[in-house]
Amino acid sequence: MLYSNFKSLNKKISKVGLGCVTFGREITEDESIRLLDVAVENGINLFNTSYYYSDGISEKIIGKFFKIKKNRKDITIVSKIHGDLSKKTIEKCIHESLIRMNTDHIDYYGVTHDPNTNLDEVLEVVSRFQKEGKILRVACNNYDISMLKSSKKIQEINNFSKFGLLETVYNVLYRGAEKDLINYCDLENIDIISYSPLGAGFITGKYKNGKVSPKKTRFDIKPSHKDIYFKDVFFETMNKLENLSNETNFSLIDLALSWVLSRDFLSNVLIGVRDISHIKKPINILENPINEIILNEINEITKNNLDLIDP
């Protein structure tokens, strides 16, 4: 396993993080705990979850794992909240998340954008929790550059805690983060972790333009993913990547994961899992990287996606 130095915590954290969105939704509690165990055995020390994943079951499973293994101190927890970000809701959610996960603190706690709540209120609440030690660093999810800058002004004026982490989508199809987020976060010492390296499975090539989604796949379970990825420009990009896959004898998964994992500006790449192979694959890629020539070809094929607005 390769490890990144997270500037915001001054801590070595695995380049691959375990996304826990499937826990309690697509896989059982026992299966989830087994995957957490395998992840730790293979050097992964970051778990990413949310107050709302599987109506709280995801966090509860993580808490049960900590209770069994007694290894909370070895793991970095990233959790978050979306939707209603009123003071009352944030306070309730953080307190409940701490109880669910059997912990006295959350390493990174992320907030999204709530158009119905004043940003000052959101930043004040999470800052207070950081100062109390219940959050080590405040994080944000899917913020664009204008939201980051607006937040910074409020944080500086009010002496609120600044963001230490940005969680954002990033893959061969959605490359918008490269336009301005990367440089800004580097200057502000904000670590970046990315999610959806395979586009919720779209980048595996299993979905075809005009065809019905295969049963029990992510797009069948959660049809809203179609609004994000079923675009003509993405199907065209996938056709080009499939040609490269055939030419190089590397699968689409190998190509997509290798490219994302090679991006130095990402402190961590989150991998959603349903079985052990989903953990082993990115680790194997880190240990046996694809050569620069092929990575550059992927870069060239997908460069037009820099101008696309992230979902």
Model-predicted regions and their roles:
Residues 27-39, 86-100, 148-153:
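Short, acidic/polar
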Residues 73-84, 108-112, 167-169:
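A short, structured active-site edge motif that brings together acidic residues
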Residues 19-30, 80-88, 112, 117:
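Active-site mouth loops of central-metabolism enzymes
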Residues 38, 42, 100-101, 133, ...:
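Structural motif
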Residues 1-74, 131:
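N-terminal binding-site loop/beta-alpha segment at the start of enzyme catalytic domains
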